A protein has these predicted regions:
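Generic structural signal for well-ordered alpha-helices
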Residues: 78-82, 110-113, 139
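N-terminal [4Fe-4S]-dependent radical SAM core
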Residues: 1-45, 60-68, 83, 87-91
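Core AdoMet radical
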Residues: 57-77, 84-106, 117-134, 145-164
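Short cysteine clusters
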Residues: 49-56
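Short, acidic/polar
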Residues: 134-140
Length: 164
């Protein structure tokens, strides 16, 4: 059985990042915009995770390692995404939304997708997800916003091997 952590407990140690913080969103690995040197940019809007998988490479929901979670203001994040696209001479055709946690826990995920999809030359938007927060309604909203593909992280179909 999967162990799903209440989002409220995650929000208790939240650090909001917006224009007033002056925190750059290019260059960090856990938040913001990540350029892997191709036509794809990774976008990480928050660090929330609703799971506590023992094998997680980022230990996203471990209080022993991560005392705080981060959530980036949507408009501030979009400014940095557009700047990264500009710095790459508008040669970005794909945005992949992922996280060191669970991207669908970001409260404005559909709006993020819609606005990213409207950036010049961005043809395809994808997202990584553990799938546990997806409902039929949410999937339809993400698709309507312009999401082209959800890459589900399925660790095992057998509870014996899946360590939540």
């Amino acid at each position: 059985m999967q162990q799903i952590i209440a989002k409220q407990s995650v929000k208790n140690s939240l650090i909001s990042i917006d224009r007033t913080t002056n925190i750059p969103l290019i260059g960090a690995i856990h938040i913001g915009v990540i350029d892997r040197g191709s036509n794809l940019l990774q976008v990480r809007a928050s660090t929330y995770c609703n799971m506590k998988c023992s094998f997680c490479s980022t230990a996203a929901n471990s209080r022993e390692i991560h005392n705080y979670n981060y959530e980036i203001d949507l408009d501030y994040l979009l400014d940095w995404i557009k700047e990264a696209v500009r710095l790459k001479n508008d040669e970005v055709s794909q945005i992949n939304i992922d996280s060191v946690g669970e991207p669908t826990a970001y409260p404005r995920i559909a709006e993020l997708i819609r606005k990213v999809k409207s950036i010049q030359n961005v043809e395809f938007v994808t997202m990584q997800s553990n799938g546990t927060l997806l409902t039929e309604e949410k999937i339809k909203a993400l698709e309507s916003a312009g999401l082209g593909r959800i890459n589900l992280s399925l660790h095992s179909l057998d509870d014996k091997f899946s360590k939540y």
